[in-house]
């Protein structure tokens, strides 16, 4: 398979994953997720197994209303069965009944297991001042 074909496939998988989250399609999200999957973000680091992921998705405290993966995504193949994708994303969510829009830089590591790609690692860094000066602390 040509490199550009695999790159397109990885970007397609990433979009499908986001769409599964938006649609609250737990089965598709689980099919696309390694067991366990390492996740990092503003809340810290976690290793999430399928049972935990399913529970999280079914009882989410937020709703993903829309998402846009911005142009400029980068895909790097580390071998026949490992690929990394990094991109910027805009997310529109409803959190505790209120609309929230955020921009973030995300990355995922995809591995091919038994002939199918699964996400083994996902990271998200919310865009903004790298020193956090644009964030408001609540007492």
Where are these regions (language model features)?
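A beta-strand edge to alpha-helix "cap/lid" segment located at domain peripheries
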Residues: 2-31, 38-139
